Regions:
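N-terminal leader/auxiliary helical segments
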Residues: 1-67, 71-261
Length: 261
């Protein structure tokens, strides 16, 4: 999931989200840009918590944010990306299925556009279109979250702007994993331009996706207005489902975090 959803879940779980918790919740999706490993960042939150307990207790809030983002123990991204009871991947991938042809048309990405509901087990099909479509479902959740809580993007950016908190987390991850602390600091400084946070509307989200596809796929064929229109449609389609899934994320994440509170 994208940053606003993680922050929103943390607000429901913690009440008040510390800057370090917010920064820790961003880390799993930033790790690659700082020389880390995405899968490791999504599965080693508890390891980081234990390391912080022994070596750097002032970074424990960041570890809590990292745990809540990840897939082991099963928290937000586990249900969004990895597991849903009737499907081979998580809920966001399931919800993306009706939009594959439209995503292919407005992004120029290739891949199977006829993927159907697949039971758990086996190997998920590889498809750039399906992956991007699941990103758009996630972005629609950013849009809905911002409409419910208009100040949430500003609150998140206050955490990113907290140089002391960023320095604490950068040093902790540097000492834990050996990654360059400067690279970690730099990747956090890029957050305001890497995501649509204050203006989380469809056009802003579409522009972020276009920039991502330029970088990741050298794809300059994105139809930004068409992508924005598709995001608006998806957001409307997801509006009634949003509170049900978000309540589940909050409930499951709160339960998994109890041993670390």
């Amino acid at each position: 999931m994208y940053p606003l959803v993680h922050y929103y879940v943390n607000k429901q779980v913690f009440g008040e989200v510390s800057h370090l918790t917010a920064l820790g919740a961003l880390w799993p999706d930033l790790a690659v840009g700082a020389g880390g490993d995405r899968d490791e960042a999504h599965t080693r939150g508890v390891d980081f918590f234990n390391w912080c307990s022994a070596n750097m207790p002032d970074a424990l809030d960041a570890a809590r944010g990292m745990i809540g983002h990840g897939i082991d123990p099963p928290c937000v991204d586990y249900y969004a990306d990895e597991y849903w009871p009737d499907h081979i991947r998580g809920y966001m991938f399931r919800e993306a299925l009706p939009y594959l042809a439209q995503v292919a048309a407005c992004t120029g990405l290739d891949g199977d556009t006829a993927i159907s509901l697949l039971p758990p087990g086996g190997e998920p099909p590889r498809s750039n279109v399906w992956w991007k479509a699941h990103n758009l479902i996630e972005m629609s959740y950013e849009m809905i979250t911002a409409s419910i809580d208009p100040q949430i993007g500003t609150q998140l950016l206050e955490s990113v702007a907290d140089a002391k908190a960023v320095a604490i987390l950068s040093q902790a991850i540097h000492r834990w994993l050996g990654l360059d602390a400067g690279a970690i600091t730099d990747i956090y400084s890029a957050v305001p331009v890497s995501y649509a946070l204050v203006d989380a509307g469809a056009l802003a989200q579409a522009k972020v996706q276009a920039a991502s596809m330029h970088h990741r796929f050298s794809n300059y064929n994105v139809d930004i207005p068409a992508l924005a229109a598709l995001l608006e449609k998806i957001s409307c389609d997801q509006a009634e489902k949003y509170p049900i899934f978000m309540d589940l994320l909050v409930e499951r994440t709160r339960e998994q975090l109890k041993p670390y509170m």
